[in-house]
Regions:
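Active-site groove signature of glycoside hydrolases
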Residues: 104-123
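Beta/alpha (TIM)-barrel catalytic core signal, keyed to glycine-rich beta->alpha loops juxtaposed to Asp/Glu
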Residues: 120-246
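Active-site mouth loops of central-metabolism enzymes
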Residues: 14-32, 82-97, 119, 123-125, ...
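A structural motif
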Residues: 43-46, 109-112, 145, 165, ...
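Short, acidic/polar
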Residues: 24-41, 91-108, 151-160, 205-212
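Conserved, mostly hydrophobic/aromatic
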Residues: 9, 41, 49, 62, ...
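Acidic (Asp/Glu)-rich catalytic clusters
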Residues: 3, 63-74, 104-110, 140, ...
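N-terminal binding-site loop/beta-alpha segment at the start of enzyme catalytic domains
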Residues: 1-73
């Protein structure tokens, strides 16, 4: 498994620009632009790339342009949500298994570093009324993923999943610190903490957002999404040396 850097790349914008939660619209990058961007992420020293089946072309493009560098980065994806104009959720065993196998094919890899349950807003029900986590644990035992994670919304679901998972993904930023307590509980258990929406979907400037998140010692990786190599360079510059690797 590749070293895990404090800054990771969230590859949403590489593949999807419909029904996003960002405060601005954007054009999808071309194939050539995607190639340059994704390889630049690794060239800049970022070793964590996160994607999902619901991110449009994201998985396919990562597989196309980074499979030859697979040993250089920690690759996470998700299962449970798909998107074709609208989000659809299916946490059945068959759907989770099919999702992971499809992701492996699109990403052109034999094993994933982590697969997160991609929960909808009723994440307690996803955790307690489906076999999503258990199915991923079975796939982990079969060697298809090294870690199992849960991407959720409520403190209750995150706290309840901790005995089962290796990683969590939660929102945490200057405007939303509700998960701070459960993030620390996760870290105390040795569960990796991945932070999404660290810049509050672009409403908090990077120079304020990045130090705020990374000064929290429970955080493993802050995921950032950008289509600009220059912005990525600036964000890395804002990351103190003591935070480079977690």
């Amino acid at each position: 498994m590749a070293p895990i850097t404090a800054l990771g790349y969230g590859a949403f914008k590489v593949g999807r620009n419909q029904k996003t939660k960002y405060g601005h619209s954007y054009e999808l990058p071309t194939e050539q632009e995607s190639d340059r961007l994704l390889n630049s992420v690794l060239d800049l020293g970022i070793t964590v790339i996160d994607t999902a089946p619901s991110y449009g072309l994201s998985e396919e493009r990562i597989g196309r342009y980074l499979s030859h560098r697979r040993e250089e980065f920690f690759l996470s994806t998700k299962a449970g949500e798909t998107f074709e104009g609208e989000s659809r959720y299916d946490y059945s065993k068959d759907a989770i298994v099919a999702s992971v196998h499809s992701s492996l094919q699109r990403l052109r890899t034999d094993v994933l570093d982590c697969v997160f349950v991609h929960s909808h807003s009723d994440d307690v029900a996803v955790l307690t009324e489906t076999d999503a986590v258990e199915t991923l644990l079975d796939l982990k035992a079969k060697g298809l993923t090294k870690l199992v994670g849960f991407s959720g919304y409520s403190c209750l679901s995150i706290r309840n999943c901790l005995p089962q998972v290796d990683a969590i993904m939660v929102e945490f930023n200057v405007n939303n610190t509700i998960h701070a307590g459960v993030m620390q509980e996760a870290a105390d258990r040795g569960v990796k903490v991945f932070v999404k929406k660290g810049m509050s979907s672009g409403s908090v400037p990077a120079q304020q957002a990045i130090p705020f998140v990374l000064e929290n010692t429970s955080v493993t990786t802050l995921l950032l999404s950008s289509l600009s190599v220059e912005h990525l360079k600036e964000n890395i510059w804002r990351t103190s040396d003591e935070y480079k690797l977690r």
